[in-house]
């Protein structure tokens, strides 16, 4: 037992690189872990900032494709009126479309 303790103490003194602590950082989104080099840590932080900005930017506005959809307002019991008489075209949903088959 004493010999084992002596060997550990000598290895720590002679080879501090073997037992030195390293900073290990993990990316929360991808789950990738890196060693503690400063350059890698900075790159990972920048990547997290960019990806979190993309997520926030994607949820802050309504896309133009969603605004282009021309869907009527279906209210039961209301008289049949065109939903938007200036821009809505005549189609099956607004009940003015004629089937010509």
Curated annotation (Swiss-Prot):
Q: How is it modified after translation?
A: Proteolytically cleaved, probably by S1P, a subtilisin-like serine protease (subtilase).
A Gene Ontology molecular-function term? hormone activity
Can you give the propeptide residue ranges?
22-56
Disulfide bond entries:
90-96
Any GO BP annotation: cell-cell signaling
Tell me what this protein is called.
Protein RALF-like 14
Q: Where is this site: Required for proteolytic cleavage?
A: 53-54
Family the entry assigns: Belongs to the plant rapid alkalinization factor (RALF) family.
Q: Which UniProt keywords apply?
A: Disulfide bond, Hormone, Secreted, Signal
Any signal peptide, and if so, which residues? 1-21
Origin, by domain of life?
Eukaryota
The function of this protein is: Cell signaling peptide that may regulate plant stress, growth, and development. Mediates a rapid alkalinization of extracellular space by mediating a transient increase in the cytoplasmic Ca(2+) concentration leading to a calcium-dependent signaling events through a cell surface receptor and a concomitant activation of some intracellular mitogen-activated protein kinases.
What Gene Ontology cellular-component terms does the record carry? Answer: apoplast
InterPro entries recorded: RALF
Subcellular location, in the record's words?
Answer: Secreted
